[in-house]
Amino acid sequence: MSYTARAAKHPSPVAQRLLRLMDTKKTNLCASVDVKTTAEFLSLIDKLGPYICLVKTHIDIIDDFSFDGTIKPLLELAKKHNFMIFEDRKFADIGNTVKSQYSGGVYKIAQWSDITNAHGITGAGIVNGLKEAAQETTSEPRGLLMLAELSSKGSLAYGEYTEKTVEIAKSDKEFVVGFIAQRDMGGRDEGFDWLIMTPGVGLDDKGDALGQQYRTVNEVISTGTDIIIVGRGLFGKGRDPEVEGKRYRDAGWKAYQKRLQ
């Protein structure tokens, strides 16, 4: 089913917007921009913006972070290039704690990030806590991804853990929009249409010295991925982000069209 067709039936406003955006821009590429200065962060995103549907941030690694200096320009770039924002916070505490972590502190994630994510380790309370924080913080729709599987070597997120995480996701059809996973997570027979976002996607490298394992674009899209997450493949090792952004966007879209046939 096409992204637009899925958007028409999706219960989540966040997922609807993202799926339509993907079809409009003809991209299923999410850029993971992990750099340490605001200037480099914003410069890379401005260059990658035309090619992406989503930017994934780790906002707490930016050394000179400020809300006015980092977040406000990020939101302007999102508007300029028509992409959404995913803060890869990986919440993993009890509901009451994550509620404060999501809405408050220095980063105030719920104010600006369309999507965030969480581990299932503490149970379904984490979904409730994050949803409450979103509702109390902003009138803008927000979405949550559950971490069902990871791309790192030796990850413990598999088997029964993954199955239990899927069960937690079923607790909220509107707020939980999908998973960080390596494959399709099912659910359609129960009325769910989860977005699958997959990190560890590379057209060139096979991995790194710290346990990251890369799979090809065609491989992940053919096994159910909706959005490919690419980081260093776009700008690491002296790569040109505009050249690589176009390359990964085209590869991702071609693989998606092949899946539709």
Swiss-Prot record:
One BP annotation, GO: 'de novo' pyrimidine nucleobase biosynthetic process
Reactions that this protein is recorded to catalyse: orotidine 5'-phosphate + H(+) = UMP + CO2
Pathway: Pyrimidine metabolism; UMP biosynthesis via de novo pathway; UMP from orotate: step 2/2
Keywords, in A-Z order: Decarboxylase, Lyase, Pyrimidine biosynthesis
GO molecular function ontology, one term from the record: orotidine-5'-phosphate decarboxylase activity
Domain of life: Eukaryota
Active site, renumbered: 90 (proton donor)
PANTHER family linked to this entry: OROTIDINE 5'-PHOSPHATE DECARBOXYLASE (PTHR32119:SF2)
Family from the record: Belongs to the OMP decarboxylase family.
Protein name, UniProt field: Orotidine 5'-phosphate decarboxylase
Species name: Kodamaea ohmeri (Yeast)
